[in-house]
């Protein structure tokens, strides 16, 4: 029994120190995000959009859409990209050996014919089978290739992209009309010093979508979906805005991001052996910037919005979250020499350690904390008091920061204009700590285990057509 008591006391210290570190980190990020959004809130976005349209004429963009079994949503995605308010783009849909009719619906919908396209084959990829070009939209291309994963599909897109900047969009995502214009703004303002920029990702489930554009913003009726919306707000509005302020970003979403092609090729393109290719690319670019003293920046931009379909069932959400966490560990492990290494500046001393200790390994400690609460409750005595205090701390950082993210979004961007939707999100955050967060912690730990045993598979995500026609995906 003495050993058990010593172990319980030791773990009490560990879990309380961990949660205190998390609360401190989140508090700092919340304050930084607030000040950044407060400054941007005073700007007239329409005036800025008009000012940058002419400047963008010299910055054409190749839009890459890797698609695997995206028959349900790819047409809406392409429509949204064709409707972008942007001076000069080319659109490349890369069909990564889909088993469904992804390529067929694109060919049929956009009246495509076989064509040749020049390529600069600097990145090794799986074989390209066929290339098609739209008769209706000459800037729209379809590239059919052997299956090689998302990273390989993006490398094919880079090889065939004719412009110096490329934008990556998931095959089930849609952009607002001004999104590409706004995500390119920091690149133009920095005269190319910003080599990559990522936009804000929102969940489209429950929205009304017509012709590739969100026509009516509505909050989904599914608690699973609403909790994911809150998670996205917390991750994007708090975490990435704060890290971006000091060039500490290690993740910009692969669902919507823009890169300068030259440094990406210099870094070797996308890693085709990891399932977290989007994060691995950003970490690799940060490493390149520091090792070669290039002085560039990677930024997150809060205003441009990309809408994407989220899982609506527990089984699909589980596959997604364990895949994300597996990709996180794989990316950090591939570049482990950066951790606590002053050679990489603040990225090595602050950002990489944060992702290792809080984001990657944190779920193990936090999940053990839930087990501790249950065990301490039944042990009684002083451990009962510890369990109550720990539960209050879990509620504090799990609920308060989620509510803060919802209020921050409502105040600064106002995606959900209806007050009842905002209150509903806040009400659900009160329940997060007792059902949703424990589940996601378990799935994230599963991702760590799968990474250790080198189990790599994406897992198919069911598409319900939330990006399809009006009213779909509710």
Predicted regions and their residues:
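N-terminal membrane-anchoring/stem segments of glycan-assembly enzymes
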Residues: 1-55, 240, 369-372, 404-408, ...
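Short aromatic/hydrophobic "clamp" motif used to bind/position activated sugar donors
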Residues: 166
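Membrane-embedded multi-pass helical conduit in multi-pass membrane proteins
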Residues: 354-452
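Acidic donor-binding segment of Leloir-type glycosyltransferases
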Residues: 79-143, 188
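N-terminal signal-anchor transmembrane helix
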Residues: 29-88
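A short, conserved alpha-helix in the catalytic core of glycosyltransferases
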Residues: 263-266, 274-299
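Long helical/loop segments within the catalytic core of UDP-sugar-dependent glycosyltransferases
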Residues: 117-155, 159, 163, 177-274, ...
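Cell-envelope/extracellular polymer assembly enzymes that use nucleotide-activated donors
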Residues: 59-62, 90, 265, 280
């Amino acid at each position: 029994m003495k050993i058990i008591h010593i172990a319980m006391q030791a773990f009490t210290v560990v879990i309380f120190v961990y949660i205190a570190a998390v609360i401190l980190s989140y508090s700092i990020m919340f304050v930084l995000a607030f000040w950044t959004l407060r400054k941007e809130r005073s700007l007239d976005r329409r005036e800025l959009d008009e000012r940058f349209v002419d400047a963008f004429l010299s910055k054409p963009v190749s839009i890459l859409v890797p698609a695997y079994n995206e028959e349900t949503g790819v047409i809406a995605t392409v429509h949204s990209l064709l409707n972008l308010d942007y001076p000069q783009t080319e659109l490349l849909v890369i069909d990564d050996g889909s088993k469904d009719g992804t390529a067929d619906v694109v060919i049929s919908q956009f009246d495509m014919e076989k064509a040749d396209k020049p390529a600069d084959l600097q990145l090794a990829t799986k074989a390209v089978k066929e290339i098609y070009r739209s008769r209706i939209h000459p800037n729209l291309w379809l590239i059919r290739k052997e299956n090689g994963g998302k990273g390989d599909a993006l490398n094919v897109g880079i090889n065939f992209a004719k412009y110096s900047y490329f934008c990556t969009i998931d095959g089930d995502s849609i952009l607002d009309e001004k999104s590409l214009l706004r995500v390119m703004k920091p690149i133009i303002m920095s005269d190319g010093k910003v080599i990559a920029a990522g936009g804000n990702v929102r969940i489209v489930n429950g929205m009304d979508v017509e012709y590739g554009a969100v026509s009516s913003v509505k909050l989904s009726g599914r608690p699973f979906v609403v909790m994911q919306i809150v998670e996205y707000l917390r991750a994007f509005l708090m975490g990435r805005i704060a890290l971006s302020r000091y060039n500490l970003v290690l993740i910009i979403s692969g669902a919507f991001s823009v890169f300068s092609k030259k440094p990406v090729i210099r870094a070797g393109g996308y890693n085709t052996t990891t399932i977290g290719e989007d994060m691995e690319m950003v970490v690799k670019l940060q490493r390149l910037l520091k090792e070669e003293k290039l002085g560039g920046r990677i930024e997150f931009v809060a205003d441009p919005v990309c809408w994407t379909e989220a899982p609506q069932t527990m089984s699909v959400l589980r596959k997604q979250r364990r895949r994300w966490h597996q990709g996180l560990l794989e990316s950090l492990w591939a570049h482990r020499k950066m951790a606590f290494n002053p050679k990489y500046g603040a990225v090595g001393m602050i950002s990489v350690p944060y992702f290792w200790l809080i984001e990657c390994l944190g779920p193990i400690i936090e999940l053990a904390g839930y087990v501790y609460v249950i065990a301490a409750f039944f042990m009684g005595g002083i451990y009962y008091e510890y369990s109550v205090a720990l539960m209050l701390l879990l509620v504090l950082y799990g609920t308060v920061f989620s509510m803060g993210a919802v209020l921050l979004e409502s105040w600064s961007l106002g995606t959900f204009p209806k007050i009842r939707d905002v209150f509903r999100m806040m009400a659900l955050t009160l329940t997060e700590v007792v059902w949703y967060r424990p589940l996601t912690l378990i799935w994230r730990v599963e991702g760590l285990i799968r990474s250790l045993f080198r189990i790599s598979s994406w897992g198919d995500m069911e598409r319900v057509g939330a990006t399809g026609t009006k009213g779909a995906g509710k």
